[in-house]
C-alpha cells in the first residue's frame, strides 16, 4: 500500500514549505514556497554560507550605500536560495516581497520587478516564479497589475473569505489560505479542541475552494500553515497544499488511508458584481480573527526580515 504522502499526491499537488534544500531532496515536491521567516532559518544553515557570501559580494557591486547594500543582499539571498531549490523541483518557487511593503502597492510592484529581474539574470524564466504578497487590499491590487504583465503571484496571509473573493476577482494566479493559524486563534479564543473535519481552518479552505469552483475562477487554491496531518488529509483534493518538512516526513512514514474530500463541481454559476475597496475593508473589519492574524503575520515576517538584515549588515560592515 502506498504511504499517506503518495496517496495524497494522487489527488493534490504537493508543495514544500521550506527553504531547506536537504528537506526538499527528501520529499520530492512539485513546487516550493519560502517566506522571510524560512529564509532567515535557511540562512543559518552552514551549507548556505556560500549563497550568503555571493549575495554580499553582489550587493557591494551595486551600491556604496550600506542601507542599499543590506536591502540588495537580502533580495539576492532570497533569490539565491530560490535558485538552489529550482534545481530540485520541476515546478515553481514562491519568493516573497518584503512584508514591510504590505500597504504600498507601488513599492510592492517595484520589488516584484526586482526579484523577477534577479531570477532572469540567473537564467530562470518568470514562468517558474511566483511573487508572494500579503493579502492586503494594496497587495491584491499590486498582484492584479503584475498578473496583467504576465508575472504570476501567490497571495499569502489569507485568513478570510473577503480576501479570497478579492483575489479571485483580481485574477491572481494562486492564493495561500492559512489553516493552522486560524485554528490557533479559535483554540485560544474558545478554549475548545476541534476534530480535523470541524477545524475552522479546514472549513475556511473548503468554503473558499467550493466558492472558486462553483463560480469558475481559475485562481489556484493552495492550503498552507498546517498544525497536524489530520488537517492535511481533510483537504485531500485541494488544488495544492504547501506543507513543512516535518509533516511531509510524518506522512511519508504513515500508511493512513487518504480519501478525496474536495472535488470541483461541474455546475458553475457566474459570479456577482466585483467587490469594492470599501466592501473589502468592511468585511475584513467584521472578521476579528482575520484582522488579528493578518496584522500579526505581517509584523512577524517584518521582524524576521529585520533579523536577516542585521545578520547581513554585520557581514557587510
Curated annotation (Swiss-Prot):
The keyword Cytoplasm belongs to this UniProt entry's keyword annotation: yes
One GO BP annotation of this record: pentose-phosphate shunt
Subcellular location: Cytoplasm
Enzyme class label: transferase
Active site per the UniProt annotation: 132
UniProt keyword list: Cytoplasm, Pentose shunt, Schiff base, Transferase
HAMAP family linked to this entry: Transaldolase_1
Subunit record text: Homodimer.
GO cellular component: cytosol
InterPro entries, alphabetized: Aldolase_TIM, TAL/FSA, Transaldolase_1, Transaldolase_AS
Keyword Nucleotide-binding: no
Organism encoding this protein: Shewanella amazonensis (strain ATCC BAA-1098 / SB2B)
Gene that encodes it: tal
Protein name: Transaldolase
Catalytic activity: D-sedoheptulose 7-phosphate + D-glyceraldehyde 3-phosphate = D-erythrose 4-phosphate + beta-D-fructose 6-phosphate
Pathway entry: Carbohydrate degradation; pentose phosphate pathway; D-glyceraldehyde 3-phosphate and beta-D-fructose 6-phosphate from D-ribose 5-phosphate and D-xylulose 5-phosphate (non-oxidative stage): step 2/3
Pfam families: TAL_FSA (PF00923)
Amino acid at each position: 500500500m502506498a504511504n499517506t504522502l503518495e496517496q495524497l499526491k494522487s489527488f493534490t499537488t504537493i508543495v514544500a514549505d521550506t527553504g531547506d534544500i536537504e528537506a526538499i531532496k527528501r520529499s520530492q515536491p512539485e513546487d516550493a514556497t519560502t517566506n522571510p521567516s524560512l529564509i532567515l532559518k535557511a540562512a543559518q544553515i552552514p551549507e548556505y554560507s556560500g549563497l550568503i557570501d555571493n549575495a554580499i559580494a553582489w550587493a557591494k557591486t551595486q551600491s556604496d550605500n550600506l542601507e542599499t547594500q543590506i536591502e540588495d543582499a537580502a533580495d539576492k539571498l532570497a533569490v539565491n536560495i530560490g535558485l538552489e531549490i529550482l534545481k530540485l523541483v520541476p515546478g515553481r518557487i514562491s519568493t516573497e516581497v518584503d512584508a514591510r511593503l504590505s500597504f504600498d502597492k507601488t513599492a510592492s510592484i517595484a520589488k516584484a520587478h526586482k526579484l523577477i529581474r534577479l531570477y532572469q539574470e540567473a537564467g530562470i524564466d518568470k514562468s517558474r516564479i511566483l511573487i508572494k504578497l500579503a493579502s492586503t487590499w494594496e497587495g491584491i491590487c499590486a498582484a492584479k497589475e503584475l498578473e496583467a504583465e504576465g508575472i504570476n503571484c501567490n497571495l499569502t496571509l489569507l485568513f478570510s473569505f473577503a480576501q479570497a473573493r478579492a483575489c479571485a476577482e483580481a485574477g491572481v494566479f494562486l492564493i495561500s489560505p492559512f489553516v493552522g493559524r486560524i485554528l490557533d486563534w479559535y483554540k485560544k479564543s474558545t478554549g475548545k479542541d476541534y476534530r480535523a473535519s470541524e477545524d475552522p481552518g479546514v472549513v475556511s479552505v473548503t468554503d473558499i475552494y467550493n466558492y472558486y469552483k462553483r463560480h469558475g475562477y481559475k485562481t489556484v487554491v493552495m492550503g498552507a500553515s498546517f498544525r497536524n496531518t489530520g488537517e492535511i488529509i481533510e483537504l485531500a483534493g485541494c488544488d495544492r497544499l504547501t506543507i513543512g518538512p516535518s509533516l511531509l516526513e510524518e506522512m511519508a512514514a504513515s500508511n493512513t488511508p487518504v480519501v478525496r474530500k474536495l472535488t470541483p463541481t461541474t455546475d458553475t454559476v457566474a459570479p456577482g458584481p466585483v467587490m469594492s475597496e470599501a466592501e473589502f475593508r468592511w468585511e475584513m473589519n467584521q472578521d476579528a480573527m482575520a484582522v488579528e492574524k493578518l496584522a500579526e503575520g505581517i509584523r512577524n515576517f517584518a521582524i524576521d526580515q529585520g533579523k536577516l538584515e542585521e545578520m547581513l549588515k554585520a557581514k557587510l560592515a
